[in-house]
Amino acid sequence: VEYRPGYIFQTSSFLAGDNSQWKPYEWGYSAHLKYSFQFKPNTCADRIYGSAYQGIGLGYYDFGNKEELGNPIAIYLYQGARIARITSRLSLNYEWNFGLSLGWKPYDEYTNPHNSVIGSKANAYINAGIQFNWMVSREIDLVAGVTGTHFSNGNTKFPNAGLNTMGLKVGVIYNFNRPKDALTKPLYQAPIPKFSRYLSYDLTLFGSWRRKGVWVGEGQIASPDAYTVLGFNFAPMYNIGYKFRTGVSLDGVYDASSNVYTIPGNGNECYKPSLEKQLALGISGRAEYVCLLYTSDAADEE
């Protein structure tokens, strides 16, 4: 169970006070219920991946404006692991969350005209932070740390300025079947086998849609259309160790919104260019941090 108070970044006039209540929305609060699982402490896998854990969570958010923003509920996967062990009972951990948030009050020209940050009832939920984890007893852990959160719909609907918070987190963890020796330094640790480096191949196919702002004169208008986005990544990856791999990727994408234009004197109608102006092919360098069931990917495209 966790409680997270957070500061709302004032990224729009709506959040700064241009709203129905004529006051800035500076603070948000959330409560979370989470369930996770992990390998048995002091095993080989537990030592390699820093006591990594993963699970599912449910969060309820209150931003102080139910009428214009709503009180969304987030459903998400999460994963975390130890960064450093400070004592036998105290560690510094990282954790990230990724999922879907539902129950927003989106922008509407007539019923919710001030809301310039959220354009859809469902939005992506992304959270990451670091925290101290103190093993109080065999059953109970206490956690405290800092965390950042982002909500947006990925340009699938306008407006999409999104909402961002930064704050604290405090929580209590109940462990159902943790061994007694998990709280002390073990007399024996399972040896970690030497890693044999090898080459693997990743193939990713993806598809989505997006909205786009189109230039008309000296300003932009929101195109009334939703545009298809399709693509692939093919990446040979060299596995350097248990937790890190790197390589290059061949990346291709078709973006139906690319180079969309208007014709002066022909209103706000949007036109698509020829197909070759909406295709892209390139290569990127990649590095991945492996976290048991998940990998964290960073890419530098050319």
Predicted features and spans:
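Short glycine/proline- and aromatic-enriched beta-strand/turn motifs that initiate or cap beta-hairpins
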Residues: 1-40, 173-177, 183-237
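Transmembrane beta-strands of outer-membrane beta-barrel proteins
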Residues: 1, 52-56, 75, 90-98, ...
